Amino acid sequence: MRPMFALALVALVAAAFASQAAPPVRRLVPRYAHIFVIVEENKDYGQILDPAAAPNIAGLAAKYGNATQFFGEVHPSEANYVALLGGDTFGIHDDDGFTCKAGDADPFCGGSSEPGYVDHTVHAPHLGMQLEAAGLTWKGYFENLPAPGALVFIASDPAISDGTRKTALYASKHTGFVNFAQVQADPRRAEKLVGFDRLDRDLADGRLPSFALIVPNQCNEMHGLVGPKVPAECSHKDALIRRGDQEVGDLVKRIQATPAWRSAGNFAIVVTFDEGAGGSRGGCCAVTPDAPSNFGGGHIPTIVITNHGPRGLADPTPYNHYSLLRTMEEAFRVKGRLGHAADTDKGVVTMTPLFEVR
């Protein structure tokens, strides 16, 4: 065999092996003008992707984009919201108050005497800060938050509440943003956390932020309440799913009625859940099964609804809230990737197929 021919053959073989070993190139997520994330609570994929149980959400999944293998990071709720915004659970694995520290005697810090208890105020950047640095805007809309920027653990309606956490309509454990020190310490950032009265006004006026986190109250997000004055549809499982499904359907319709949705700019509404029901530890993508706070929060529904994107798409790629964060960072063209959103070597990839533009 001639030397030149042998070298060429070796090069061809090497190239063939390299092409087989290289992972597929994932296309860049298109630039988005608006991404609104609606979060519901504590339901498994199979409970919701059933037209008989949740016709609105199941219908949206069939019509738009369905992430069929999407997972939470942990149980219970609080750390999943933090993970969505900051790329990590930061050691949180309970629903204690956002100011709780080890040894704190506050009733909202029930686990503070446990070994390894972490500061629930997170001293790390969040998605809102990335957006600010890029000249973009953000807001959190939380139903029954008593006032813009209110740094409270719970808020109740006297008509149904007995003053306990189990009857509170608003719960800070379902906000995420309030855990970050930069929100707690800066009134200008805290005032970006508002109630649904402001959501109504912003949708009517067309003054929409680049990113919005939208969380209904505990009757409307499928979490549920327990108490003598709590309506049956807020505590009975099937009725609770129907109520939350109706809330999601209404929110999506109202967002789709805005001029921004009908414009040339790209707009996405993501309907997701914080965690699955029960104690399922199913997870993916930079989770650590034996970790106390990042072990996987179960298989959950996640629907991506876009004004110019795919229709009738079921995407079986494994994703979680870190994947969604990475996708939003790319869609908004912000600098850097927060926490586990950077862990492509651990399976955290963008949700490109669900955000592509037709």
What is the meaning of each model-derived region?
Residues 6-16:
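Bacterial N-terminal signal peptides
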Residues 21-358:
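N-terminal pro-sequences and low-complexity stem/linker regions of secreted or lumenal proteins
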